[in-house]
């Protein structure tokens, strides 16, 4: 007898309605809730999924390498990276006639192709790849790695090779492995690749499988390393007129601290990058050995936390400090996942900021569309990770938190202070919202009445002070690094080696861009969005176990619609609802953030910074001079007279709006509407001559309120992303290629 889906839940499998299908999909990855699940089995399943995840990443990398080698123009691009557009892949079946075929036959190709805005060409080139053959080799290597990861995932599900629960709960050994081996050694290994392959290639010396054993990365060899004379490796760096990829102007240094950028590539010096990875690797190898594993030396994290008690009798007694935290964190996968997601979210946002302001890949700074795409991509990923962090924090409080084990410690005291925390966030959000919007609207009104001189324009003097302290001279503040005789400047001059940082910060680069009143306003708009998103997420987590309105909330789980009639006000207050609302605010915030970044850069790249500076101080300026003005080219990607190479983005722009608007159908009309509609459709089917031949194995029932919301949210999010992605890429590539 065939068992119905889902096999992991007999309760759901026996449900006679379509709820079986939807709840089955919704809980497929909630391993904790599956029938017969033990804690050990849960850890083993999750451990194996990590290998599956690695395999997917490997296949994705392999596919990119393969398609660029097969259908791209990598070798032509390497010969002239500033003028050749990189090709992502061919278009097999171009629609819409000869005009479209002609429009997409671009970048020197003989048939229709897509342009790459991923930055992969720049990355491959920077790390020492120059031929299609090398790309193919990389692709095959990643494919083998993926197959190995899939095998490892399967293997660790077999009875003989399943790790025990004690192995998973050994936090010190896991930290040792992750910090020292995965993070530390891989950073040092990457330094090795940069020193042995990438830096020689950047100086015109090819290093391959045929000669890597007899090409010395440094003329002095390992002598200076063993004699402690490490400074030799920083001597004779590349000169300012070095031609990347050739020996012209090349030095011999491999580990430097030059600062600033290579003048030709406008990217960080490869020798600086190698030095950075070596330092990071050494730090992490040391960090990984701080904790006590099998050898009885080093710290016990539990002992540190148990001992870490605040002094008694201080103003505002701090209770039991960190007592109980070790077991709480070590026994809760949701707590650990929340910490990991929050950390990764912050790092991803930092990656977005650093990729444009201090680019590490050769010539990527001049590929404007790629810069815009990568910044936006990483900020969107960051908000998704951060929302996930708070979601799992809330699930921790519902499923894993033990009030007895955490009595009076920092976690318990945070819950006790939740009213103060939530009300402060509320106050900050209200303050930022009213003041920022008030300034924008005031400026809108006076501009509309023809008196722009009456705008309230605030110079961001504190931010300008930070820029000046870091060496930006244009503000005339003469502080720290922007004052040649200050203690900071004198100390910097005494550090051996070249110093190109001041040239970078005062040159035509993206480090510390000049800022004014428009930046001040949008900075506070973004701050409003961040604080409101945080308010909703923090409130959702802190109230997840219960509130004055619903003290027994934890008994209802993470997501519930309401507690039925007779208990008014219990709708929309589950921890899941907080996550749901926060995602809208997160999208709102990342929208403002990416609008700001993109418009400011469009103005810089086109040599018309006045447009941003003058129009960004009132809302109509944003709507008219950023959104409307930059969508005109995009909307004309195709029209009655034909199409150009923006046609695909024009279509995606429309399609994104459609998906986004569909979200509202689910967000506004609730369960009763859908139930009535479904019953009407079932009635019509049963009375139609052909449709009545189809029977219903499950009785059709409408989505629950929570499900309708998640479907609406998914459409809203996907539509929002598709719409802005199309706008961003088309408006940038339409101007700059």
UniProtKB/Swiss-Prot annotation:
Chlorophyll a B1 binds at residue 657. One of its GO terms (biological process) is photosynthesis. InterPro entries: PSI_PsaA/B (IPR001280), PSI_PsaA/B_CS (IPR020586), PSI_PsaA/B_sf (IPR036408), PSI_PsaB (IPR006244). PSI electron transfer chain: 5 chlorophyll a, 1 chlorophyll a', 2 phylloquinones and 3 4Fe-4S clusters. PSI core antenna: 90 chlorophyll a, 22 carotenoids, 3 phospholipids and 1 galactolipid. P700 is a chlorophyll a/chlorophyll a' dimer, A0 is one or more chlorophyll a, A1 is one or both phylloquinones and FX is a shared 4Fe-4S iron-sulfur center. The keyword Lyase does not apply. GO terms for molecular function: 4 iron, 4 sulfur cluster binding; chlorophyll binding; electron transfer activity; magnesium ion binding; oxidoreductase activity. The keyword ATP-binding does not apply. It catalyses: reduced [plastocyanin] + hnu + oxidized [2Fe-2S]-[ferredoxin] = oxidized [plastocyanin] + reduced [2Fe-2S]-[ferredoxin]. Phylloquinone binds at residue 674. It is a multi-pass membrane protein. Gene3D superfamilies: Photosystem I PsaA/PsaB. Its main location: membrane. Keywords: 4Fe-4S, Chlorophyll, Chromophore, Electron transport, Iron, Iron-sulfur, Magnesium, Membrane, Metal-binding, Oxidoreductase, Photosynthesis, Photosystem I, Thylakoid, Transmembrane, Transmembrane helix, Transport. [4Fe-4S] cluster binds at residues 562, 571. One of its GO terms (cellular component) is photosystem I. It is found in: Cellular thylakoid membrane. Chlorophyll a B3 binds at residues 665, 673. Its EC number is 1.97.1.12. It comes from the Bacteria. It is an enzyme of class 1 (oxidoreductase). The PsaA/B heterodimer binds the P700 chlorophyll special pair and subsequent electron acceptors. PSI consists of a core antenna complex that captures photons, and an electron transfer chain that converts photonic excitation into a charge separation. The cyanobacterial PSI reaction center is composed of one copy each of PsaA,B,C,D,E,F,I,J,K,L,M and X, and forms trimeric complexes. PsaA and PsaB bind P700, the primary electron donor of photosystem I (PSI), as well as the electron acceptors A0, A1 and FX. PSI is a plastocyanin/cytochrome c6-ferredoxin oxidoreductase, converting photonic excitation into a charge separation, which transfers an electron from the donor P700 chlorophyll pair to the spectroscopically characterized acceptors A0, A1, FX, FA and FB in turn. Oxidized P700 is reduced on the lumenal side of the thylakoid membrane by plastocyanin or cytochrome c6. PANTHER family: OUTER MEMBRANE PROTEIN, OMPA-RELATED (PTHR30128), PHOTOSYSTEM I P700 CHLOROPHYLL A APOPROTEIN A1-RELATED (PTHR30128:SF19). This is Photosystem I P700 chlorophyll a apoprotein A2. It comes from Synechococcus sp. (strain CC9605).
């Amino acid at each position: 007898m065939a068992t119905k889906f889902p096999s992991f839940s007999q309760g759901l499998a026996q449900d006679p309605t379509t709820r079986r299908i939807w709840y089955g999909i919704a809980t497929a990855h909630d391993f904790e809730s599956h029938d017969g699940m033990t804690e050990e089995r849960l850890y083993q399943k999750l451990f194996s999924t990590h290998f599956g995840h690695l395999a997917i990443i490997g296949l994705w990398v392999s596919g990119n390498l393969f398609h660029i080698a097969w259908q791209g123009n990598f070798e032509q691009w390497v010969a002239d990276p500033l003028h050749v557009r990189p090709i992502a892949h061919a278009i097999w079946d171009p629609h819409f006639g000869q005009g479209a075929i002609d429009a997409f036959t671009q970048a020197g190709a003989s048939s229709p192709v897509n342009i790459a805005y991923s930055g992969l060409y720049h990355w491959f080139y920077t790390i020492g790849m120059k031929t299609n053959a090398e790309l193919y080799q990389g692709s095959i290597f990643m494919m083998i790695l993926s197959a190995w990861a899939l095998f490892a995932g399967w293997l660790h599900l077999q009875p003989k090779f399943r790790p025990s629960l004690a192995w998973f709960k050994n936090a010190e050994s896991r930290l040792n492995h992750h910090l020292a081996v995965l993070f530390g050694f891989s950073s040092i290994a990457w330094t090795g690749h940069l020193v042995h392959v990438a830096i020689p290639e950047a100086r015109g010396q090819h290093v391959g499988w045929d000669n890597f054993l007899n090409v010395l990365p440094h003329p002095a060899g390992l002598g200076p390393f063993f004699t402690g004379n490490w400074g030799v490796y920083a001597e004779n760096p590349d000169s300012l007129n070095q031609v990347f990829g050739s020996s012209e102007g090349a030095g011999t240094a491999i580990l430097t601290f030059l600062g600033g950028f290579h003048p030709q590539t406008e990217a960080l010096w490869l020798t600086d990058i190698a030095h950075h990875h070596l330092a990071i690797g050494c730090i992490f190898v040391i960090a990984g050995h701080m904790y006590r594993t099998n050898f009885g030396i080093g710290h016990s994290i539990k002992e540190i936390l148990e001992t870490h008690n605040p002094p008694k009798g201080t103003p505002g007694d701090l209770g039991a400090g960190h007592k109980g935290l070790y077991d709480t964190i070590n026994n809760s996968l949701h707590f650990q996942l929340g910490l990991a997601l929050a950390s990764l979210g912050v790092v991803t946002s930092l990656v977005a900021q650093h990729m444009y302001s201090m680019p590490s890949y050769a010539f990527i700074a001049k590929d404007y569309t790629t810069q815009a795409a990568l910044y936006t991509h990483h900020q969107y990923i960051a908000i998704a990770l951060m929302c996930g962090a708070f979601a799992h924090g809330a699930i921790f409080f519902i499923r894993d938190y033990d009030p007895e084990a955490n009595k009076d410690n920092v976690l318990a005291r945070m819950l006790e202070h939740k009213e103060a925390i939530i009300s402060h966030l509320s106050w900050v959000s209200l303050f930022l919202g009213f003041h920022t919007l008030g300034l924008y609207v005031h400026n809108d009104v006076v501009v509309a009445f023809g008196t722009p001189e009456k705008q309230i324009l605030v110079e961001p003097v504190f931010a300008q002070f930070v820029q000046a302290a870091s060496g930006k001279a244009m503000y005339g503040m003469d502080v720290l690094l922007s004052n040649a005789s200050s203690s900071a400047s004198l100390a910097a001059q005494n550090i051996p080696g070249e110093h190109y940082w001041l040239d970078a910060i005062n040159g035509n680069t993206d480090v510390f861009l000049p800022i004014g009143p428009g930046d001040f306003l949008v900075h506070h708009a973004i701050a409003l969005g961040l604080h409101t998103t945080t308010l909703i997420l923090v409130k959702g987590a802190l109230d997840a176990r219960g509130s004055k309105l619903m003290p027994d909330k934890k008994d209802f789980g993470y997501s519930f619609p309401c507690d039925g009639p007779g208990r008014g006000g219990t709708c929309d207050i589950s921890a899941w609802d907080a996550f749901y609302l926060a995602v809208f605010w997160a999208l709102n915030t990342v929208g403002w953030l990416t609008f700001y970044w993109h418009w400011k850069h469009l103005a810089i790249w086109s040599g018309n910074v006045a447009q941003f500076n003058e129009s960004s101080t009132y809302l109509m300026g944003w709507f008219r001079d950023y959104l409307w003005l930059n969508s005109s080219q995009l909307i004309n990607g195709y029209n009655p007279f034909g199409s150009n190479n923006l046609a695909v983005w024009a279509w995606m722009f429309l399609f994104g709006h459609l998906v986004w608007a569909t979200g509202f159908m689910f967000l506004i009309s609730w369960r009763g509407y859908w139930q009535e509609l479904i019953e009407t459709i079932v009635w019509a089917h049963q009375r139609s001559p052909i449709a009545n031949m189809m029977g219903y194995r499950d009785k059709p029932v409408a989505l629950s309120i929570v499900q309708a919301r998640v479907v609406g949210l998914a459409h809203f999010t996907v539509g929002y992303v598709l719409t802005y992605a199309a706008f961003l890429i088309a408006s940038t590539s339409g101007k700059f290629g």
